[in-house]
Amino acid sequence: MLRLLVFTSLVLYGHSTQDFPETNARVVGGTAVSKNSWPSQISLQYKSGSSWYHTCGGTLIKQKWVMTAAHCVDSQMTFRVVLGDHNLSQNDGTEQYISVQKIVVHPSWNSNNVAAGYDIAVLRLAQSATLNSYVQLGVLPQSGTILANNTPCYITGWGRTKTNGQLAQTLQQAYLPSVDYATCSSSSYWGSTVKTTMVCAGGDGVRAGCQGDSGGPLHCLVNGQYAVHGVTSFVSSLGCNVSKKPTVFTRVSAYISWINNAIASN
């Protein structure tokens, strides 16, 4: 159930079956963060039996709304979000547990065609989050903002710490500078798999997203402020941390109008 798209569908786009996107991301090559370093980060969890399990990340964008990846909520399951969490396996005393009341997936999302984009969803919570030093709203970029190449960014999440490894118990972060579209869409990188509605970051072969990071934020520093410019979407099927295969994110600035309309109409 851990999600981070592995691009299994890339063969449909002229790629060999040995290198395709995978949608189950976690932070590889990262470090544990101190508590409340990224207070807009949430853990999206699904219920199985009487227990809850982490499946994806997400960002609190309104007191009753969370932004995540569409592929995280494809299945018909019962979800909740955990805000203010740090260690998934213990009670930090700062958590807020809120049920997901409604899931709004982008209408153009197609789980059989990840390369088309639209890997974004917003979740309406059953009650409003209480904002404090551990739970804050994420800052979204202005509509249409394009990151300059090598913009400082951090991915955060509880995803696997290495390809085929275990989930992290404490929240991790990894420095992933942005890779501009011209570079990321070149033949030696992702080629035509990457679209202008996506953001690439990393690709050094050391640090990356991995299974369990999906849906979580890419925090980028622009004009002195960190904003959530990406929603973690997919990595290469060859592994999470493959050189010249940056982690790929949904570009939040391409969907600001959709986000606002989805919230207003739901």
Curated annotation (Swiss-Prot):
Show which residues constitute the signal peptide: 1-16
Q: Which cofactor does it need?
A: Ca(2+)
The record's annotation in SUPFAM superfamilies points to: Trypsin-like serine proteases
| Pro-piece positions | 17-26
Could you name the domain of life of the organism this protein comes from?
A: Eukaryota
Keyword Zinc-finger assigned: no
Q: What is its main location?
A: secreted
User: What residues form the catalytic site here?
Assistant: H71 (charge relay system), D119 (charge relay system), S214 (charge relay system)
Q: Which residues are glycosylated?
A: N87, N241
Q: Which CDD domains match?
A: Tryp_SPc
What this protein catalyses is:
Hydrolysis of proteins, including elastin. Preferential cleavage: Ala-|-Xaa
A GO term (biological process) for this protein?
Answer: exocrine pancreas development
Q: Name one GO cellular component term.
A: extracellular space
Which UniProt keywords are present, listed alphabetically? Calcium, Disulfide bond, Glycoprotein, Hydrolase, Metal-binding, Protease, Secreted, Serine protease, Signal, Zymogen
Write down the EC number: 3.4.21.36
Q: Say yes or no: keyword Ribonucleoprotein present.
A: no
Q: Which residues bind Ca(2+)?
A: D85, N87, Q90, E95
Q: Which GO terms describe its molecular function?
A: metal ion binding; serine-type endopeptidase activity
Question: Which cysteines form disulfides?
Answer: C56-C72, C153-C220, C184-C200, C210-C240
The note on the cofactor says: Binds 1 Ca(2+) ion per subunit.
Cellular location(s): Secreted
Q: Which PANTHER family does the entry link to? A: CHYMOTRYPSIN-LIKE ELASTASE FAMILY MEMBER, CHYMOTRYPSIN-LIKE ELASTASE FAMILY MEMBER 1
The UniProt family comment states: Belongs to the peptidase S1 family. Elastase subfamily.
Q: What is this protein called?
A: Chymotrypsin-like elastase family member 1
Origin organism of this chain? Bos taurus (Bovine)
Q: Which gene encodes it?
A: CELA1
